[in-house]
């Protein structure tokens, strides 16, 4: 048993488990993932580590080499450059070839497409650009296909085949970072590509992801031979073409439409779209699309297989008439909830066996496709985290995964910093390596039962998720309040809690700055083994509200977070538009939905404050334009003021007197929900992410409505507290040290007090008997932690929490975002949304108290001492770099640079300590009670 430091008070320890890994056998270890699932490592096929997030693999025509496209964030080993790796299949030697054109600040990125030339002498890779699509600046390529010469398995850049802007059709308009794009044109942003037999050598068919089209070009000259428009209407992009596949004779091809729930059949010689084949489209136009992604032609080209990542299915299409004959079910045995994400395909040479990479199940499903009446898999092969590509080579199945074995501690200095002179801890996105495994198929056939059982265990489908047993028997909880904050690790805040597993040397915002969260943890329970499922805000807010992401999220966020060569297509926006308002699916939406949809379907009341809501600010509008500056609905005044400057009078809806804040506060013009279920279920006066808008005002607005809920309960008239309340309190993100913005300490202290005030109000109200409050960060990307880069703070607060102020509780159970979501669902009687939350054990130990937790009293010290009002000066460390950062939306600033600035601001010249722990602990117990 691990020993903990002594404290001035006794601590009630609920359960002791290891932090991440347990010894399963002398050969294997069980690794816990932030997805709540587990891996047995090493897994089948002796995986080798690769650069970050491989998305495509391709076998050379002679079968000697496997090329691997790594289009993630980049790792220290690759100098943070994207790369193509080459595996020599005879020797098993893996060599990586980073491309200097794809460094962390590059104006282009790899994106999905990889193919060998027909003679194996060249390798083609799609290269896409948003920030310099023209390729005008030195070192910038623009959009096109990078061509590499291959000699003895070694790559060297040979030429670049540029793609011009795609013409728009009549009435169409381009709405994806359209600034700088020529009129009547669209940015092609090449994705999947295929080599096509041409008259004079190789041609290339390229999916143009942002232009909603496909183009056939000469592989040498780049001359456009045919162009195919694939838009569903006038908005470009809307269908987002993903991949292409062509017949051997070069006459026909198919293009999968990521957001179109379809594939388009193309006549390559005639230059026509033969037909569009719908594949499990949504019932409503704005519901999630089926995500047609990877495609594969059978060896005899009579069947086309299409992975539908958002439907847990693979479509089997007869190429003779374009009809979908059947759909293969990629779910695991006994799986009743969705969420497997089939996103890659491979087939045996005899056409009998189809291999499907289930990204969300960490497994490959194996189908006998000649058994026409059967649609379920024969068995499953376990993989490392998030398989993204598969290929068959002889008796081997080659499997690439996007996230390998995850992260680990990030408490030391970055060995090879991306930005010299700005040393910081390793950034979570640069710690995620992919992997490539070689599984012997004959052996997997023999071991299929054992392998399938391992997949079921890894997906927690053989265990019990537990029940919440209150001391008095009946579940008293009728209301849940869920608070989502931004980006902090456990050690940054709670590393100073002596009786839990923290590292004091990593504390940046300890008890003096976050007294309320410390007090809450000590009263209601310290969770020192909690992990955020998301890596960054782009996927973190999806994880935190849907208990899953989408394959679109996973394949784009690392590009967004490396050099901004993709838009932040999350939280209800894609490019320059809101899909809901455009009447089309949001490509980022998981098919299994969000919490608010689950609540609506089961007739529970809910209200949302700031999450998946877009605020338009008066600072962005013309003065005196009509807007709702936070006034009650139906009484919209104009934006008479854009902001409140220091010392100016506060507007009535924000308080009385003069502003005590030393920085200007923007005013709300109006709010727009980005999801249909949030219409009429959001507070129009509550701000979204903007970190210069104090969390005190957000708390004020919620408490204004909460006062009405209390009155309604006391009088029995009016609207009472909804069953579910979602609050976004984002200011612990900070605005760095930008002059004239709140200091990091001010932002974090402001956020802390807002949390404390909400809990104080609820716990001193009639709702205390039947309300539970949950608090987490959407991700933990903005700090160091000595256990794992995903480890973060979480609070579970109710009258039924165990422990007392004299004997605080410490819970060492392994928990993630998914456990927290499943617990909220269980308390409200909601079914799970998907296979993730369905099998994540509930946080039952946190409701074993005697219903005697007293009301909470907030700590106002940092209001009274003025900390929350302070602004950065021009002399603050990192002020010049912070001044160039965008803090209007989540993570628009370079998080790695921001982290270095925040460390300097908090710790001065103190160097980061070396990692004290590894992710492999001595023992682990997964509780099922």
Region locations from a protein language model:
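Residues at structural and domain junctions
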Residues: 8, 34, 43, 49, ...
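A detector of low-complexity, intrinsically disordered, Ser/Thr/Gly/Pro/Ala-rich segments
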Residues: 13, 23, 245, 381, ...
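Intrinsically disordered, low-complexity, compositionally biased regions/tails
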Residues: 10, 124, 148, 175, ...
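Predominantly soluble domains enriched in secretory-pathway, periplasmic, or organellar proteins
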Residues: 16-467
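N-terminal pro-sequences and low-complexity stem/linker regions of secreted or lumenal proteins
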Residues: 432, 447-929
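Short alpha-helical segments used as structural interaction elements across diverse proteins
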Residues: 2-3, 249, 300, 725
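Bacterial N-terminal signal peptides that target proteins for export
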Residues: 1-11
